[in-house]
Amino acid sequence: MVLENIRNFSIIAHIDHGKSTLADRLLEYTGALSEREMQNQFLDKMDLERERGITIKAQAVRLNYRAANGKDYILNLIDTPGHVDFTYEVSRSLSACEGALLVVDASQGVEAQTLANVYLALENDLDVFPVLNKIDLPAADPERVKQEIEDIIGLDAHDAVLASAKEGIGTREILEEIVTKIPPPQGDSNKPLKALLFDSWYDQYQGVIVLVRILDGMVKKGDKIQLMSNRRNYEVLKVGVFSPAMCEVAALSAGEVGFIIAGIKDVQDAKVGDTITSLHNPCDGPLPGFKEVQPMVFSGLYPIDTSQYEQLRDALAKLKLNDSSFSYEPETSLALGFGFRCGFLGLLHMEIIQERLEREFNLDLITTAPTVVYKVHRLDGSIITIESANQLPPVQEIQYVEEPFILASIHVPNEFVGGILALCEEKRGVQREIKYLTPTRVMVIYELPLNEVVLDFYDRLKSITKGYASLDYEHLDYRRSNLERLNIMINGEVVDALSLIIHKDKAYFRGRDLVSKMKELIPRQMFEIAIQAAIGNKVIARETVKAMRKDVLAKCYGGDITRKRKLLEKQKEGKKRMKNVGNVELPQEAFLAILKVEG
């Protein structure tokens, strides 16, 4: 196939704006799927993707289309994840394309994530053209949304395609736009092989399958290839395309998109953004933009039933096979037993992994409150990174602590702006700007500490705005902050699973909330229990669970006071001894409830 007749494109859209449904229509129209095979959201292979309406992994499908001009074209649709946590994956998938469809809901208009991904596309020099979806809805207002696209994004939208993926309206027009507006790929099949790896996953029979976009050269079965980031060498066992089922082809050449199977055993070796080249005739250098993805949010995962520890370990290993951005290592907690400390790209990534563990592997888990990566500058000049409160060195060794900040852009209807500003101020945010995008929609931009966002920011945001807000964020930098470790002590013993790193201004309120919550949850014992919140050696809040009392005087009818006193003294002694040796069992509910205390 000549380069002139190939088009590589992706679809950019906010969650629920109809991206996967539109992809279904394109597959159906070009005959890639028969009516019988058609299932909604065909490209979202995981149940979880379909259910939450999000795309987690990239997919690539080859469509054959005969255009109005009579020529046959190959259209490669690269389906990208649309969520903020997967920004790096999106940017790599986009760099495999020459153009993108910007799908906007004709009733809702432009949302925060749409903006972020459009900017990524423009950074990668893609030609972007808008499509207004859901025009069949009664609330659709195409003219207003066209104006929004022009005002906010700066794209010319006067001739945007009007479509309804659900009803199949506008599908042909979209395909014609792809052929006419998106440029063909550049590349030279005679040069040394240079291919961009933009996704990989594990297949239990064939090892790791990698999705690639060939930029120069060609690759066929039997070739020796090398991954440039780690210099590993492999022999190609199979090359092919998805149409949308896997089809083996003789070779993939410049401009094409397809898969390579080369007996790679570990997804860790096939990193997104890497460059693949020929072992004996390598290209001059790797593609720019490759970076190792670093986890930003950490959380402890513990099985509720300790006998499930091995199952949890196997489950994590299986998930890691398909997700190189997820990391885990074993850790133990005095309170929760054996578990794992896991690293995630962000909150959605964390939720997805937890849900997959519970759903696909039937595990019951406790997750500790999410934390972020802090940088601790010690007095001896060294810098250490920590991701849990238990790793924080003693106060006397610390010079200062830095925490990560993010730049958050929040799109909200204007009646909710007051509530959003109050929430951001409460979360120690620094206001950057407020833009009125339209008379009814506002974009609020804040710098926020990631630590404050990981706990409950998103839930609070949604409840303040009745679900109308959309949030997008990017990582900024590390900043010096006044952070301390807050410990919860029960009868003088520190409960390690409940320690947290918190800003000094909030420590007192958080400590008070935690101890009063625990007072309700810890069952009464035969002796009194002191629950304290402390910073270092200084106790800042305390509650006491009163002891239950057995009436030892019940058998004394009247009689001498000294007899009664003797029995009471004896009871007092017993309680004292009990308090020294008795340890308090914390019920599981106590942990779960504490993790839900408002941040």
From Swiss-Prot:
Domain tr-type G, residue spans: 4-186
Primary location class: membrane
One GO cellular component term noted in the UniProt record for this chain: plasma membrane
Cell compartment(s), UniProt: Cell inner membrane
UniProt keywords, alphabetically: Cell inner membrane, Cell membrane, GTP-binding, Hydrolase, Membrane, Nucleotide-binding, Protein biosynthesis
Amino acids binding GTP: D16, H17, G18, K19, S20, T21, N133, K134, I135, D136
CDD domains in the cross-refs: EF4_II, EF4_III, LepA, lepA_C
Family matches, as InterPro entries: EF-4, EFG_III/V, EFG_V-like, EFTu-like_2, G_TR_CS, LepA_C_sf, LepA_CTD, LepA_IV
Any one biological process term the GO annotation gives: positive regulation of translation
Topology in the lipid bilayer: Peripheral membrane protein
Molecular-function GO terms, alphabetical: GTP binding; GTPase activity; ribosome binding; translation elongation factor activity
Catalytic activity: GTP + H2O = GDP + phosphate + H(+)
Entry EC number(s): 3.6.5.n1
UniProt-listed PANTHER family: TRANSLATION FACTOR GUF1 HOMOLOG, CHLOROPLASTIC (PTHR43512:SF4), TRANSLATION FACTOR GUF1-RELATED (PTHR43512)
Function per UniProt: Required for accurate and efficient protein synthesis under certain stress conditions. May act as a fidelity factor of the translation reaction, by catalyzing a one-codon backward translocation of tRNAs on improperly translocated ribosomes. Back-translocation proceeds from a post-translocation (POST) complex to a pre-translocation (PRE) complex, thus giving elongation factor G a second chance to translocate the tRNAs correctly. Binds to ribosomes in a GTP-dependent manner.
Family note: Belongs to the TRAFAC class translation factor GTPase superfamily. Classic translation factor GTPase family. LepA subfamily.
The protein's name in its UniProt record: Elongation factor 4
Provenance organism: Geotalea uraniireducens (strain Rf4) (Geobacter uraniireducens)
